[in-house]
Amino acid sequence: LEDPDGTRILYDPGFTVRGAGDPRLGKIDAVLLSHAHGDHLGPAHQATANAGACGKPAFAVKDVPNSNLATIAAGKQAKILAGSDMHLFLAGKVKAAGGDPKQVQLVRFGAMAKVGGVGVATVPAVHTNGVGPEFLDKGLGDMLRANGLTANLGPPVGYVLRFTNGLVVYLSGDTGITAEQDVVVRRHYKANLAVINIGDVFTTGPTEAAYVIDELVKPAAVIPSHANEVATQGGKVIPGTRTDRFMKAVHVPAHVPLSGRTMQFDGSGRCVAGC
């Protein structure tokens, strides 16, 4: 996400960013992590663009135990903003990746940090936040794995970003339906653009996410994410997919993200280019 003042923020890179050398990144000022599950923290990444198939990408470059996120932050000398108890864990990972632990900044619920001109707040999410054994020291990781456990890093979070042009973006992270989506995200922060997960089973599904948008957050527009499917073909949404079901259920303009396309929004949450 890029502010008009040039501040650039990366959110939950997971598997999808090809390390700090990914040419799509450019300058990165801060990295956000909603929770420490592998698909957000990143145990591996693709060696080249589009490696593998859309439904089965190839992640040949291993990033454990440090994580793709920590490697990117260290390589870009970017801040990491994190809530709960994730900051101490991430500080160790950044140090191991060659960075400075002081790059990691804690942002608890109710606070707002600044990165350049962008305000960054954490908001509650309803999910889990266990970090997998592959990210831990071998002895501890093996012990947890043998007992079917993960290391808990406290509550997961979502984010609200306040940009200098007036745009206020809600990044849901992985979550179910929460009262805070109304009380905190809509009433207090007045988010006018939302990026919401629609993956179902583990998080809100298409109809639940549409309810969150239409009845709780009430933004001017929404971007569906984390659908856990091959959602598009030839730039068009595939009929019958979760993405298709969400697009039909929600009542505000919904913009599907496509590789290689940049979307631009004005201060009211209206898409003005790339949608």
Where are these regions (language model features)?
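Acidic-and-aromatic substrate-binding clefts and catalytic sites of carbohydrate-active enzymes
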Residues: 200-206, 231-234
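Short, solvent-exposed loop/turn and secondary-structure capping segments
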Residues: 44-46, 133, 206-207
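Divalent metal-coordination and catalytic microenvironments
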Residues: 1, 12, 35, 43, ...
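Conserved strand-to-helix beginnings and helix N-cap segments that scaffold or border functional pockets
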Residues: 181-182, 206-207, 235-237
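Core dinuclear metal-dependent hydrolase active-site scaffold
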Residues: 1-24, 106-186, 264-275
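Active-site metal-binding loops of divalent metal-dependent hydrolases
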Residues: 13-15, 36, 85, 125-126, ...
